[in-house]
Amino acid sequence: MFEDRPDRDAEVVLVGRSNVGKSTLMRELTGHDFSTGGKPGVTRQPNHFDWASESFMFTDLPGFGFMSGVEEEHREAIKTNIVRYLEENADSILAGVVVMDGKAAVDIIDRHAERGNIPHDVEMFGFLEDVGVEPIVAVNKTDKIDDLDERLDEICDRLGLYPPWQQWSDQIAPICAKRGDIEALEECLRTRFHEHNRDDLLKFVS
């Protein structure tokens, strides 16, 4: 089980496959450095960054899926803990951000689907909806994508969102975390905070 979670009333969680840039995105959102690396699965426990006075925090949950040098049993345990964390804290989670590698996501999703498996990203997107947390998809590494609109349409299609992607701009956020280009995600988060009557949190995404 994950270590103790800080007792906060409001939270934004980052979820996604290993090595999609969640820790880099967490750094851009908080201004605080976290462990990052090219080796998938560096983050094994949640990273929390909180503001006690507002009872608010960002949480980077461990990556799921392939992790080099990590046994399948341990990967499954991490996934189980992620699911449990989201279930137990759904009432305080204002937004669940599913971070994807924009260049690789469609191929990975299609490869799993062809094997008859539910792709992890699609499963997590649906799971967040099931527990009452409206997901935001942060499509990262846009600097590596040739035709961004086409790729975002394809991702929407895989998630069951009817293209064009622009009509889902409150849920689909193209970003490039390593370049600090996260404005589309911040706009989505501002919308969520306002919907939850937490305009006091807008300063954290401005």
From Swiss-Prot:
GTP binds at residues 16-23, 41-45, 60-63, 140-143, 175-177. Mg(2+) binds at S23, T43. Gene3D superfamilies: P-loop containing nucleotide triphosphate hydrolases. The keyword Oxidoreductase does not apply. Residues 8-195 form the EngB-type G domain. SUPFAM superfamilies: P-loop containing nucleoside triphosphate hydrolases. Its cofactor is Mg(2+). Belongs to the TRAFAC class TrmE-Era-EngA-EngB-Septin-like GTPase superfamily. EngB GTPase family. Necessary for normal cell division and for the maintenance of normal septation. NCBIfam families: PRK04213.1 (NF003255), small_GTP (TIGR00231). This is Probable GTP-binding protein EngB. It comes from Halorubrum lacusprofundi (strain ATCC 49239 / DSM 5036 / JCM 8891 / ACAM 34).
